[in-house]
Amino acid sequence: MTRIVNAVQIDRPPADVLDYVTAPLNWPQWHPSSVSVDVNTGQSLRISEQVREVIVVGGRRDRVLWVVREYDRPHRWVIEGRGERGGTAIITYRLSPAGRGTAFERDLVYQVSGIVLRLLDVLFIRGRMRAGSRQALEQLKRVLESSNTSGIGSPA
């Protein structure tokens, strides 16, 4: 298993940040691996709710079925996924107040399937995943700190 942890300070309240990042329609706006999702609501996913996401990682396209495992607004959200190619992942978002904003942490633990993909992960995919995760949080900060995101991803 591979673990990638990234953190960023965002000048928005924790509830705003969590509401935005847990609404799947927003994922392609800030995460470079996210191509599309199969939902048409901008609402946060709650425990046991599911979404299918099309992703591209290391040049490989996959469809992942995500299931929410934990939802503690505005502090923590955990989602578990399984790709059609056999890979698995758990993503945990941790949020805490930081001044007038939020300390946001994204913790990704994933495993690819098959010996060939495991080798490619060590040689190639892991580096791309690390870079994509850094870029995702930079883009998230930029999107949420822009003036046009008020009201996006509000809880149901």
Protein language model regions, located:
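Generic structural detector for well-ordered beta-strands
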Residues: 7-11, 38, 54, 67, ...
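Short, surface-exposed coil-to-beta transition loops
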Residues: 3-5, 61-65, 87-92
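Short beta-strand segments that buttress and anchor functional surface loops
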Residues: 49-56, 77-84
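Short, highly charged C-terminal tails/helix-capping segments
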Residues: 39-40, 139-156
